[in-house]
Amino acid sequence: MITRAEILEKTKEVIYESVPELEGVELREDTVINTDTAIDSMGFTLVICRLEAAFDVRIPNRQWQRLSTLGDVVDAIEKRLTR
């Protein structure tokens, strides 16, 4: 089973690959995705879609608006992986 730390690292990799402008920016679990980073709503949609593909999970669209921090995103992925 994948650990939370592994989910976090893979999530960061996907974000850095999806948003090259974030190169050199430290992403922590408390990083607010839409305000602390250069990710706009379209970029956020791209990141979530790529994360769903990377982890082979589906995060319902209605839950996306509740994903504020990197930790929230990791929580959502972790929850889906343990189902």
Feature map (PLM): residue ranges:
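Thiotemplate assembly-line natural product biosynthesis machinery
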Residues: 1-24, 80-83
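Charged catalytic carboxylate motif
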Residues: 10, 69-72
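Phosphopantetheine carrier-protein modules
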Residues: 18-38, 54-66
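Two-component histidine kinase catalytic core, primarily the HATPase_c
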Residues: 43
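C-terminal structural segments of small proteins and small subunits
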Residues: 71-80
